[in-house]
Amino acid sequence: MFEFRKQAMRQRRQLITRVVVAVLFVLLCFGILVNRLWVLQVERYQGLSERAERNRITLVPITPRRGDIVDRNGVVLARSHRDYTLEMVRGQVGDIPKMLEQLEQIIHLSPLELRRFKRRLGSSNRFASVLLKSNLTDDEAATFAAHSYKFKGVSLKARWVREYPEGESAAHVIGYVGRISERDQEQLEEKGLEGNYRGTEVIGKKGIEASYEERLHGKTGWEEVEIAASGKPVRVLKRTDPIPGDNLRLSLDMGLQKLVEGIYNDPKNPQRGALVAIDPRNGQVLAYVSAPSYDPNLFVDGIDVENWRRLSDSPDHPLIDRPIYGTFPIGSTYKPFVALAALTLGVRDPNAKIPDPGYFEYGGQRFRNAGGAAYGPTNMHKAIVVSSDTYFFSLGPLIGVDALHDFSQQFGFGKKTGIDLMHEKKGILPSREWKKNAFKNPAQQKWIPGDTISVSVGQGYNSLTITQLAQATATLAANGVYTKPHLVNWIENPVLKTVEQTVSEPEYKVDVAQEHIDLVKSALSDVNATGTARRIFAGAGYESAGKTGTAQVFSLKGTKYKAEALNKRLHDHALYMGFAPVDNPRIAVALIVENGGWGSSVAAPIARKVFDYWLAPERANIPEYIPSFDDEEQQEEISPDLEIPENIPANPDDNAPGHTPEILASIDMNRNGRDDVHNDEAGAL
């Protein structure tokens, strides 16, 4: 009995202990829970509340409309328009092949579109929006909208698409836009501009599109969108409208531009080359031709392999921007500047007559006139008019290469002109220092007299751009006043309705006497009146000045030049520089026809047509552009990536019969792959 009671008491104590432990455990858990609730509801309330709000609200970028580019008369060269696309988020589509099969029943997908889609799909993450089809017609967009509920993860979107209405015309000036690359993204981040490019797929790659990117792009807008638990947008809480990019009005005249392009691109005799025309009074570039050209529209959505190979493998190199990137010996067009150097440095009396037997002998070597011509006693005026190589051969050693370098550079040779395009080359204006740095072999580093003699007629190591020659010609026409050339005349803000004129002020005046300039101008005028270009300019209703030039492509080594016996690519380059009218120059021109032969017979006729067009009496009645926004329409900016209906149907069956369901565009902060071939510098696959 006693043992039984003792055992009962022991069990009771154990029960009490267990109850106490259980109670303490419950209290401990409750304490932990209360503490956690305190932390969440009090201590961390603000931060967690903001995080929850961020999870509920998504920022959707609204891409701004890129600014237009027009010529001086308002001809549209680049513009943006709306384009419908189909895009897919891989993570939201279960069976992609089945989806494509169903989609093809209502919208045609070409084999090329499918190949590109699969290629993009392979390089994207599961949450990225991948382009499936672009350039949908209105009918195709409406058809998909009516069946959109069948295609989960596929959305219809609108985007801004760049268009170049003039095609190949002025392509090297305008340039093109292309998909934002990793390098572009890094550069945007370095400048702190990546936020302004959210939702933007393209960026300026070449030409004006690149050099004025920040003005053309505009400012990205934003929408704060409330997102349902299903991930669908519910409503827009706040909207900041995008600011469209500025419009650019160029100094180019497309009538003149197309006239020159038509000459170079003559189907019967297409030519390679470049031409730049500048107004010497203000630096406005009136024409800028690089032939052959290309269609910038090919690059907007990414150029395909076939077209890329056609352009990049062409022996005519249409992608090269010849006026600023191609460098050439400029031949006799350099002689007027050599003459000015001699006059300024006082190395020869311009009236002194130098014997010209058809060659100049120096150090036991004979340097011959082109064509073996002999001009007899020749002064400076005559030497320019008849283009006596012998006369200028003899000037070279007297001036010296370094002095000639320093003087010529004042006119724009051997340095960047500052034209508002990227990737301009400095070219080669040789000097002793240049040669020392250009060659590793000590024997080749030494400057010899023969080098100076060749340079003095625009040959030898001279390798300059046509833009530099045009700028030097404009500076000479302006009596030594150097004004930086520019392509953009006006920048128009469509929102503020303001305009900004990009006037180039003269940078400096070349240190040369007016009497020396007048002497050279007089000789250049006689070149067109009685000299090497007299036949071309006969009957012109204005007085012009100029200089023809012929630059050797390879050395003849003492043999006679016979064009008919040479491969076309070995023919001499034909050049011309000039300005008109002589008394008050309004246009200065420099041009080259690659492997064209003689400048007087090939290049000068092009200049004559340019002068005739620009100085035609009827052009005197064309008024100068005066900015006005009286007829400007306000352009409402809407999000190309988001359409939110007022009432969201729970499913397609909730709609009335025949009702087209609303489109809920998926919200994707990632950029879309656009092309299977893209290059940053028009150079690499």
Task: Label each residue range with its predicted role.
Residues M1-V305, T327, D402-G412, T452, ...:
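Periplasmic/cell-envelope proteins involved in peptidoglycan metabolism and beta-lactam response
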Residues V593-E594:
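Ligand-site clamp/hinge motif
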Residues F2-K6, R13, E226-R239, L252, ...:
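Beta-lactam-recognizing serine transpeptidase/beta-lactamase-like catalytic domain environment
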Residues D631-E632:
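Cytosolic-side transmembrane-helix boundaries in multi-pass membrane proteins
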